[in-house]
A protein has these predicted regions:
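Bacterial Sec-dependent N-terminal signal peptides
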Residues: 1-24
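A short, structured loop/turn motif at beta-sheet edges
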Residues: 95-102, 127
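Lipid interaction determinants
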Residues: 20-91, 106-154
Length: 154
């Protein structure tokens, strides 16, 4: 009788733990996706995409654009001075390599002139709420897909 009672108790505890493991695993998966980890976006096409990053400072606003066309990339920096209202820009071109969710950008031409130190970025492709993002691995800056941004603004 005791063995039967312990056996049933053990069996019930095992089933309870399995149910908790399933819900805990779902929660961890959602958290990983929110962080950008454990997403399988190999089939997402980023060709002909434009990503935007805007940073506001006290004296100026910085807008950065990453435009991807095939294996080439155009990286544009636009600086808007708040005091004078003037804008200046730098247009870099280069190449891009993508392995799964990681995107490596190397822009070594500034307005068709080779620069000694190219602009390099290592970016993680993520998707949250059906919006594509590129997250800078080093700085944690987030570029949003302009197409997704313009859809939500309409």
């Amino acid at each position: 009788m005791r063995k039967l009672l312990f056996g049933m108790l053990f069996f019930g505890a095992a089933l309870g733990l399995k149910a908790q493991y399933g819900s805990l695993n779902d929660i961890l998966t959602r958290l990983e996706e929110r962080k950008g980890i454990n997403q399988h976006l190999e089939n997402v096409n980023i060709d002909n995409k434009k990503f935007v990053f805007i940073k506001d400072f006290e004296d100026h606003t910085e807008r950065d654009f990453i435009i991807i066309k095939g294996n080439t990339v155009t990286y544009v920096e636009v600086f808007d001075d708040k005091a004078s209202g003037e804008s200046s820009s730098n247009v870099f071109t280069g190449d891009i390599i993508r392995k799964k969710n990681m995107v490596s950008l190397r822009a070594n031409m500034l307005e068709n002139k080779k620069v000694p130190i190219p602009v390099t970025k290592t970016l993680l492709l993520t998707k949250q709420d059906n919006i594509l993002y590129l997250i800078d691995v080093n700085k944690k800056d987030r570029w949003i897909d302009e197409e997704s941004f313009s859809k939500t603004k309409k």
